[in-house]
Amino acid sequence: MKIEILYFADFKDITGKSREFIELKENTVEGLTSKIFNKYNTLKNLIWDDENKKLKGNISIVINDKLIKEKNKGKMKLIDGDKVAFLLPFAGG
């Protein structure tokens, strides 16, 4: 299946892209992140909690313009044509 990934902020800086399409065999968010980490290892530090072996809790995931609120975001199923974005927490003042 083919998934579109949208990159913003630090993600865009690291990848040098605002979007890309990735062929995916495993149909979960964790499967997608694994594929992304193989291509852009630096992204792993931004969104992966090595100690707990899961996505960091402060990372927001948007699939097809809908914010995912499930506790275990990594297990979310993806289907062909999904559009996915990972968002870092907003800072301001």
Label every model-predicted segment.
Residues M1-G92:
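Ubiquitin-like/PB1-type beta-grasp interaction modules and other compact soluble beta-rich domains
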